[in-house]
Amino acid sequence: MEQLKQLLTAAGIAYKENEPLAAHCTFKIGGPARLFVQPVDRAQLCRAVALCKAQGVRYYLLGNGSNILFADEGYNGAVLDISSMQDAVEVHGTQLTAGAGVRLSALCKTALEHGLTGLEFAYGIPGTVGGAVYMNAGAYGGEMKDVLTTVQYLTAEGEIKEATAAELDLRYRHSIFEENGGCILSAQFALIPGEPEAIRTKMDELMAKRLDKQPLDKPSAGSTFKRPVGAFAAALIDQCGLRGYRHGGAAVSEKHCGFVVNLGGATCADVLALCEEVRAIVKEKTGYDLEKEIRVVR
């Protein structure tokens, strides 16, 4: 690790030691990262990945920190903070190209400014472009795969490659990047011309729905369980009388049973124990076996 620190410094790449990960995720849970690396552009990100590989240091790519749960003991390796990158959105006709570190909200606003429709569903999803593509994020009837055309990524071997959306095995909360270890660098989206006022109205309606239905006033990782075939996780959890059910500082949200929230001082252990208890009760009472949507990073 000392050698890696020296190499990062020589390359002009900023980093912090023992940085609390709770400060960098929407759940507000997690111990320290041994190294918290903050590349400012694609070149620094690629260099940081190469240095980690060369030094045999495990690494994790972090976007906006939604949909993840960091371990209480933290991460014994290097967390690469993509959200620190000075990425931008480029507009070419009806095509948008965005760096992995761009916030989804910024991407949606750019589409609105240029009168392009297709991304309204993503407005309010608390994540970056890279994270959204990685998990094929979606809401209110839309998914990233509906508008994604190509992705540029860094392979596990250190090569920069491009792939079409059809090559990414995009399905419900999944992409090929979960298996191939690739690092998303940028993504291109194909939209269609629309009326700015209609686009704005749709975005405002969906945001209002989020504020009304979701517990955005409390720390969480977003939707906690994947939607089982033929049912809805939140409805099953509510049906089992688990609204407000808690373990330590973690609880099933009173507002939306599909969310586990941090009531204050929750630990990773609290959340995992709660999820397992909820899963077991739902399985016993309904026959459905819920699968976590949030990713646990140890």
Regions found by a protein language model. Give the residues of each.
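Conserved active-site and cofactor/substrate-binding residues in soluble primary-metabolism enzymes
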Residues: 22, 40-43, 102, 106, ...
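Phosphate/pyrophosphate- and phosphate-bearing ligand-binding catalytic cores of soluble enzymes
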Residues: 16-17, 68, 154-276, 280-298
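Short acidic (Asp/Glu) patches
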Residues: 105, 135-137, 166-172
